[in-house]
């Protein structure tokens, strides 16, 4: 498994070039409206979306666009992660967390893919990054953070879909665990 996309911008450009990303240029409220649109797109295996003018809680338009549904299908997620089948990413992660040292001692060449993946993962230190081009005072209310559901306790930065597999039955569970 190699990570095929090194930056979010490259991934979004790829999606847009392939007709898998739409842009909404009209203002869209980050409380419920953006989430409802993304929910419909996910349920219909639709394209990724960029809200170019997300409307914040105070009614102002954020200068920062909001991207949603960028991993909205299994195929899109596998492509983003450079995987050829659905279990590859999980299998590689398990292999990295619990490598079979005995197998590697007998057949050292089997460790090469694992070593390649591990070496590709460490952070790279840079003096300046693209994220430092825009400087602003810290104010989280100025970020287009969605509030997705009416009973949510607030706006959540993360909304991951976590897939787990029961080791006995093999059944899968899809859950959301947010911060």
What is the predicted role of each segment?
Residues 1-179:
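Extended, highly charged
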């Amino acid at each position: 498994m190699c990570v095929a996309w090194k930056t979010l911008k490259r991934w979004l450009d790829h999606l847009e070039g392939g007709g898998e990303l739409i842009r909404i240029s009209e203002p869209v409220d980050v409380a419920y409206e953006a989430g409802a649109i993304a929910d419909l797109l996910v349920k219909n295996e639709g394209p990724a979306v960029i809200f170019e003018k997300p409307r914040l809680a105070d009614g102002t338009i954020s200068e920062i666009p909001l991207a949603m549904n960028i991993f909205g299908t299994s195929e899109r997620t596998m492509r983003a992660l450079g995987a050829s089948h659905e279990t590859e990413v999980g299998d590689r992660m398990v292999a990295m967390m619990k490598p079979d040292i005995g197998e590697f001692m007998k057949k050292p060449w089997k460790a090469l893919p694992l070593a390649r993946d591990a070496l590709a993962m460490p952070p790279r230190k840079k003096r300046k990054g693209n994220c430092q081009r825009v400087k602003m005072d810290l104010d989280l209310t100025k970020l287009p953070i969605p509030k997705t559901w009416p009973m949510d306790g607030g706006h959540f930065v993360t909304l991951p879909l976590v897939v787990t597999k029961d080791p006995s039955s093999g059944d899968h569970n899809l859950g959301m665990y947010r911060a």
